[in-house]
Amino acid sequence: MNKSDILLNSINAFYILPENRTILKELLNKTGGISLRNLEWFITNYSKKNNLTYKTRDGKLFSVHCAYKSSLDGYSKKLFDPFCRSNKMQYIVPGTSDKISTTVAQLNFIRWCIKNSIVDYIRNHHSDLFNKSGILQKVTPV
């Protein structure tokens, strides 16, 4: 087994949970109100510029940009990337018969966003982050 296969086993265990599966499908099918491009921009630009730190669901203090850089260093772009820049595969979403064209790197990135409450944060602050034209705007972090 290579790194990608080992990671995929862990990813499958994560996406077997219905709430995680739902968020994955919403992001990849563009039905949840958050695009992958906006998610990536929020993590790489907004969180760095605003030094964004918040408490996650389990009460831990989380610094978005620092954690992102640390995860990127640990996984590299080959295994941690919001966009399908490597070999795509037909991923069967655990617990369903749904197939999605994606990469291990993209599945891992989305898992990281869900686990660290980034998707929740963007949803809870959506009106503050986005203006009416759909562009992220600078706001003071909460």
Which residue ranges define each predicted feature?
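Amphipathic alpha-helical interaction segments
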Residues: 49-50, 87-90, 116, 120
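Surface-exposed beta-strand edges and their flanking turn/coil or helix-capping segments
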Residues: 54, 95, 136-137
